[in-house]
Amino acid sequence: MPVADTSQLTSGVAERYASSLFELALEQGAVDSVTADLDRFQAMLDESAELKRFVASPVFSAEDQLKAIIAISERAGISGFFANFLKVVARNRRLFALPGMIKAFRVIAANHRGEISAEVTSAHALTAEQENELKAALKGVTGKDVAIAVTVDPSILGGLIVKVGSRQIDTSLRTKLSTLKLALKEVG
């Protein structure tokens, strides 16, 4: 299967699972608690390369994935709908799509609140003040309230990459250095 087909499959799986989780959470009035648990789990993924590898790896059996997810959920204080959701995802061997499920859930929740969703990649964690300034700037551009999901990626070296819908603004130092490198190659 070509890479493009694999990513579309993952995206479709992620959206279906996220949609089901959102509908259940909405029905039970638990969207905020599920979102908080989602944020906690995403923070764990961002901080642990080992957890990222575990989630992405097809090597582990469904039983091993389930045991690990139960232990991780308990340690992180994740309970209720999201803990049960993680168990279903592990049993169905869909952990590889979990990062996409988290993104899709955030988009669905933001749309439900009348907001637009923005994905922000930063070299370092943003302070609450920086997040608020970014939200205000994006609201000024889009005219809507903005829900942001911040991912830390030290490889961008500095600056930000902001994705809103199909638009992307890349002010990362990595991109600027790459552009400079290409310009220097053309000159020399």
UniProtKB/Swiss-Prot annotation:
Membrane topology recorded in Swiss-Prot or TrEMBL: Peripheral membrane protein
Single GO MF descriptor: proton-transporting ATP synthase activity, rotational mechanism
Keyword Cell inner membrane tagged: yes
HAMAP family: ATP_synth_delta_bact (MF_01416)
Coiled coil region boundaries: none
Lineage: Bacteria, Pseudomonadati, Pseudomonadota, Alphaproteobacteria, Hyphomicrobiales
Subunit structure: F-type ATPases have 2 components, F(1) - the catalytic core - and F(0) - the membrane proton channel. F(1) has five subunits: alpha(3), beta(3), gamma(1), delta(1), epsilon(1). F(0) has three main subunits: a(1), b(2) and c(10-14). The alpha and beta chains form an alternating ring which encloses part of the gamma chain. F(1) is attached to F(0) by a central stalk formed by the gamma and epsilon chains, while a peripheral stalk is formed by the delta and b chains.
Cystine crosslinks: none
Matches recorded under Pfam families: OSCP
Principal location class: membrane
Gene: atpH
GO cellular component: plasma membrane; proton-transporting ATP synthase complex
Similarity field: Belongs to the ATPase delta chain family.
Protein name stated in the entry: ATP synthase subunit delta
Subcellular location: Cell inner membrane
Protein's job: F(1)F(0) ATP synthase produces ATP from ADP in the presence of a proton or sodium gradient. F-type ATPases consist of two structural domains, F(1) containing the extramembraneous catalytic core and F(0) containing the membrane proton channel, linked together by a central stalk and a peripheral stalk. During catalysis, ATP synthesis in the catalytic domain of F(1) is coupled via a rotary mechanism of the central stalk subunits to proton translocation. This protein is part of the stalk that links CF(0) to CF(1). It either transmits conformational changes from CF(0) to CF(1) or is implicated in proton conduction.
InterPro entries on file: ATP_synth_OSCP/delta_N_sf, ATPase_OSCP/d_CS, ATPase_OSCP/dsu
PANTHER family: ATP SYNTHASE DELTA CHAIN (PTHR11910)
UniProt KW keywords: ATP synthesis, Cell inner membrane, Cell membrane, CF(1), Hydrogen ion transport, Ion transport, Membrane, Transport
